[in-house]
């Protein structure tokens, strides 16, 4: 059974791993999510201008240059 994540955690993990050069297929397998959900998460991040950085086990998310969220 996959680990429970919030929608923002899922988006953060996808974006950070893509930024690190990990292949989409590996990320989908790691998160155990369908192609459609993966595509939605990437599209959501792009459309909302989210910038996600991983720092000390947390994902810091900014939107339009302002703090948006911080998730584990």
Pin down the residues of each PLM region.
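Extended low-polarity, hydrophobic cluster-rich segments
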Residues: 11-12, 41, 68
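Proline- and acidic/polar-enriched loop/turn elements at helix boundaries
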Residues: 29, 40, 57-58
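A short, conserved structural fragment
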Residues: 46-56
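Hydrophobic beta-strand residues in large extracellular and virion-surface proteins
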Residues: 14, 27, 51, 59-61
């Amino acid at each position: 059974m996959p680990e429970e994540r919030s929608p923002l955690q899922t988006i953060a993990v996808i974006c950070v791993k893509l930024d690190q050069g990990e292949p989409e297929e590996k990320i989908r397998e790691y998160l155990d999510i369908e192609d459609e959900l993966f595509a939605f998460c990437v599209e959501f991040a792009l459309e909302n201008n989210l910038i996600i950085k991983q720092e000390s086990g947390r994902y810091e998310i900014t939107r339009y240059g302002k703090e948006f969220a911080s998730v584990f």
